[in-house]
Amino acid sequence: MDKALWVVRDKITTKGAIDDLMADATTRGIHDVVVQVRGRGDAYYTSSLEPRAEGLPGDFDPLAHLVRAGAAVGVRVHAWGNVFFVWSSPEGALPKSAKHLVNRHPEWLLRSGGVKYLDPVGGSDWEGIYTDPRNAEAREHTLAVFTEIVTRYRVEGFHYDYVRYPQATYADSPEDHAAVTALVSEGAKRLRAARPGIVISAAVFPDPDLARDRVLQRWPDWARASLVDLLCPMAYRRDTAEVARLLTKARAAAPKTRMWGGLMAYASERALLRDQVRVAEQAGCEGAILFAYDPAHRDLLDVFSAA
């Protein structure tokens, strides 16, 4: 069974943190880490297209060190890029960099019914600022960013997250429903051309019907067309029976595509997580991936030791 971790960008800001990540992975037989290097339209790597992430110290290149450190210990590094989700701020502040696409190209941003993009549309369900999936220039920029990453860095794979609309209320035409898949389709061509053999993966809503109807994420279509090599349905539930139901349904929707069951690593609930890893395997998943790596709760990674 494949064992993998999602690693959020705030856990890779120093060499020491990355070295600790690799040590934690190797001691538990974890050979794949999916690491967030494009979180909010910014770069945790050296980029000519997007600004350096705010708060990233000095001239440190996290992705370069990840690739080197992973190669030294046999851990495969997958670069994780948020696709349409490009900014969020609890205070409603804009990015500091004038080069950030939110500042450079506000015309690319998704709006609903004329509402300003910084206003919380949908109350507590509002996630942040998205680019409009229908906007061809925005899609082109995003694909150029992803291609830059896989060209410059010897990553094992590229991982899409937020490859969807925030809510179906933003969509009202057939073009809306095709826009997300248009990016995934073009991405498959470009990333595979830039780095032959690359593993293209996506984090997806686990129920394919809800994914289609609520956020216009038609991931079973991507699987059938071989646009992705690996799917990670995010079955984030404490109810293990519900996790089993969701992963079984996901497996049936894409029976020929490699799949890792996405599980929430709830703090202090190691027994629950161990049961859910077992459930993912029973549902037919080739592996499990935990959200998310946290050195403060590294004991949760021990669930993989017995898997």
Regions inferred by a protein language model and the residue ranges of each:
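Short, acidic/polar
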Residues: K11-T27, A136-R152, L210-A225, V243, ...
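Aromatic-lined substrate-binding rim segments of carbohydrate-active enzymes
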Residues: M22, G39-N82, D172-A194
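Aromatic- and acid-rich polysaccharide-binding/catalytic face
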Residues: E156, Y160-R164, V215-A241
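Boundary/entry segment of secreted carbohydrate-active catalytic domains
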Residues: M1-A17, A25, A202-P206, Y266
